[in-house]
Amino acid sequence: MELADEITIPAPRDRVYEALNDVDILKACIPGCEELEKESDNELVAKVTLKVGPVKARFSGRVTLDPSKAPEMFSLSGEGDGGIAGFAKGVADVELIEDGETTILKYVAKAETGGKLAQLGGRLITSTAKKLSKMFFEKFEKIMSGEVELEEAS
């Protein structure tokens, strides 16, 4: 499965990059996120509960950031284990383009699933991934614009 999108964030690139590395902001924006902790400068561990069609699962996962070209570009890779529900793993390439006082965020993500999740079918997985991505970025935009305080977003 592959997802790609472009979102305009109402903040300068450096602020957007910092926010995308802020554990509290990420935890507030990630749908179903129960725990998110920084293990190192480039590694996060998380517990997330998600419902995909009829399957509800609690995933334990790890995300690794490659900031070698930051803040213009960075890559993420991650995997999560949902027990009997299956697993998900993927990679994403993110580009942050300065546009005056705003930032254009472009991403391309590739993911694969296994177990019960994979049996649900590609269309359901893709539509759920798009919905979750939209929820993340809507909340992220509201936090970055000041429309919602971080405490309210949690």
Model-assigned labels for residue ranges:
Residues 5, 34, 61-67, 90-98:
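Hydrophobic/aromatic beta-strand elements that line small-molecule binding cavities or substrate pockets
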Residues 33-36, 62, 114-117:
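A short, glycine- and basic residue-enriched loop/turn
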Residues 12, 41, 70-71, 99-102:
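Short strand-connecting beta-turns/loops that link adjacent beta-strands
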Residues 1-43, 47-51, 139, 154:
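Hydrophobic ligand-binding cavity/cleft-lining segments
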Residues 37-79, 135:
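Glycine-rich portal/gate segments that line the openings of hydrophobic small-molecule binding cavities
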Residues 2-6, 43-45, 58-60, 73, ...:
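Intrinsic-disorder/low-complexity, polar/charged segments enriched in Ser/Thr/Lys/Arg/Asp/Glu/Gln
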Residues 80-127:
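Beta-strand/loop substructures that line and gate deep hydrophobic ligand-binding cavities in soluble
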